[in-house]
Structures are given as C-alpha cells and as structure tokens.
Amino acid sequence: MKQLLFDLCRIGGVSGSEEPIAKFCAEKLSAFADTTIDKNGNVIATLGNANADKTILLDAHLDRIGFIVTSINENGFVKVASCGGIDVRVLSDAVLVSCSDEPVKGVVCCMPPHLSDGGEDKAAPIDKVWIDFGLPYEKVAEKIKIGDVLTFYGEPKELMNNRITAPALDDRCGIAALIRCAELIGKKELSYKVVILLSVQEETYGTGAKTGAYRINADEAIAVDVSFASQPDVSGQYAGVELAKGPMICISPILSKAMSDKLISVAKEKNIPFQYEPISGTTGTNADHISVTKSGVASCLLYTSPSPRD
C-alpha cells in the first residue's frame, strides 16, 4: 500500500492536465473492474452488480495543485499563475518541475534578506513570483511554453513512527484507498452496483465531480478526501485530531445525516477507529457537487488515510 501511494505521489496531474495520473490509475483499476476514461478525463470503474437497482458512488480526485505558465521574460525567468489553492508561504526557494515529457526543474526566486529593505519580509503573492530554470531565454523557450503546467518537486519520504511525507497526498491518499477498495471488492457478488469515480479538476472548479456524478446517476455517494490534524498552535476543532487515530467522518448540514450515521455505525460495529469533523456549511470537497447532482444524491464525506484498516 505504501509503495502504491508513493507511486501515485510521484506522478503529475495538475488540475486540467490529469492525463498521466488518469492513465496510471485506469491501469491499476482495470485489474479489478470494468474501467474507462471519459471525455473529461475522469476515471470510472464499475464493480458489483451492473444490473442492480441501487448504485453507490465512491469519489476521490485525481488532480493536484500547481501552476500555469503565463509569461517568459527576456532573461528566461518564468511567471506563473496558480492552479488551485497555493499557500504562498511555502514558495520561497521551492523547487518546481514542469509536467512535460522531459521534465525541467526550476527554483522560485525570492529576495535575499541581506538585500531586503525590510518591506519584503512577507510571503510574495503569486503575481510577484518568478521561476528561474537556470537557462537563457532561448533554452527556456525550447523547454517551457505559455500554458505549460508546473508542480512542486519532491520525492515521497518515510519519516519515523511509520509516518510519511509527500507532495500531492491531497488526494492521492483517497485514490490509494479506493484502488485498495476495488481490489477488496474484486469480482464479489453484490446486491448493488459500485462505481469508483476518480475525478478531475477538484482543486479548481469541480468539473469532474459535476459531470461524472451526472453520468453515473448514483443513489448514494461517499467522497474521499484529506483534512487537517493537530500540530503546534492548532486550536479549535482540529486540536484533538491525531494521525493514526482513524479517518474523519464529516458531519455537515449539506451532507446526508443518514449516510454519515451509517458510516459511524459501521465503524463502531467493525471496531474501526474514527474521528469526527463537524463543518457548519459546505465542505470544500466534491461532496458539495455530488450531493446536488440531478435530483440529489445522498452523500457523505470521509477524510481518510491510506491505511487498509480504514
């Protein structure tokens, strides 16, 4: 499972450019399910009883945050705009890599503190950031084009105490969990149809969830994503959330209470540890889109780990 997650995190797939990760996931799922990639780039895998009256949808998103190239200046420095929610605090000196057939690495330029006048001690906004690929304009223009996408470069790493760190754990954790789910279900005879939707563009517009859920027309849905955990100075609802203490079941007025209660009931019955995430409104995940598809889909949200236990 760990190797699968590491493999997933090494693959590109910035919003709108999910082809590499879609292809990888489709190949994995095809071993267990009837799998296709639709015209929007969603991966759709069908298991269980194809003729059943009831369909349950399991969703995780393919895309990861990144950047789109907007201009290249005469010195070969590249300007970008964000694709998804970028925390500008992590950009200083970050290494980015182009999502192309021949990836090229560059570093985010920042003002050295020795040269700063004191007014540049805050994180620079995206529109003030330049990427340095270490090449003159002519060479950069050969390798980087306007509209190309970049993402954060970094190898998955194993930490102590069975912890890991990697780029794109949002939502490669969810994908790993659903691939494992497909493996466990396999060719089992079920009284209902299960459709796994690995959706595109969650980080930007939710296109994949909107169109995929419309096509699948499920009765019920579980969206699988990631959330926050306790760390120094964190207070409020996340202060008590801990790693390795089980997935978080979301409680929200826009979700189906019956579905959320069912998740809680099953977890207790099977002795699966879990935690709560209460949210007072929309969740910022694909569950928001899926729940209002067509005449409505009874939806719940699971913030999961890639542990087979969960």
For the regions a protein language model found, what residue spans apply to each?
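N-terminal hydrophobic/helix-forming segments and targeting peptides
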Residues: 1-305, 309
